[in-house]
């Protein structure tokens, strides 16, 4: 999946690189794909030839455009490539069911862990940088507190 965006700096020496790749792997030859969980609204809601209405939406292409993070809380300023939570949630919903296990081999700021919590998945995160590990743990725990508090509001 390619996440395309149009924010951040520009270069005068080459085209601006305004995309990130998301690699999705699965154990074994068969993989799960929950197409109904990732459908998006169609630009055309009716087949002009048959008159059939498209009510379910359509499965998106492998290039997803999302120009910024949902909220400033979703973006952490200490990691250069914080991923968008909506993008991660869509990927996680597409390839896993609730209570499945997601492995993030490059945990960074912990965005995948947060998206897993928000979609009721378990996760394992791996990271080499001990500073990132400490900060990611704190960031993931802060989402736990927010969710717990919102249950009482």
Feature annotation, model-predicted:
Residues 1-135:
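Core catalytic lobe of class I
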Residues 137-153:
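S-adenosyl-L-methionine
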């Amino acid at each position: 999946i390619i996440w395309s965006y149009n924010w951040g700096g520009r270069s005068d020496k080459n085209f601006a690189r305004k995309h990130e790749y998301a690699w999705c792997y699965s154990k074994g030859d068969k993989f799960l794909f929950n197409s109904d969980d990732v459908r998006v609204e169609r630009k055309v809601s009716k087949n002009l030839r048959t008159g059939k209405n498209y009510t379910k939406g359509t499965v998106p292409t492998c290039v997803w455009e999302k120009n910024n993070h949902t909220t400033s809380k979703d973006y952490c300023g200490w990691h250069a490539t914080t991923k968008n939570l909506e993008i991660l949630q869509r990927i996680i919903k597409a390839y896993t069911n609730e209570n499945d296990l997601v492995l993030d081999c490059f945990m960074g700021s912990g965005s995948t862990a947060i998206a897993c919590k928000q979609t009721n998945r378990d996760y394992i995160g791996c990271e080499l940088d001990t500073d990132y590990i400490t900060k990611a743990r704190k960031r993931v725990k802060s989402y736990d507190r927010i969710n717990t508090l919102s249950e009482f509001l």
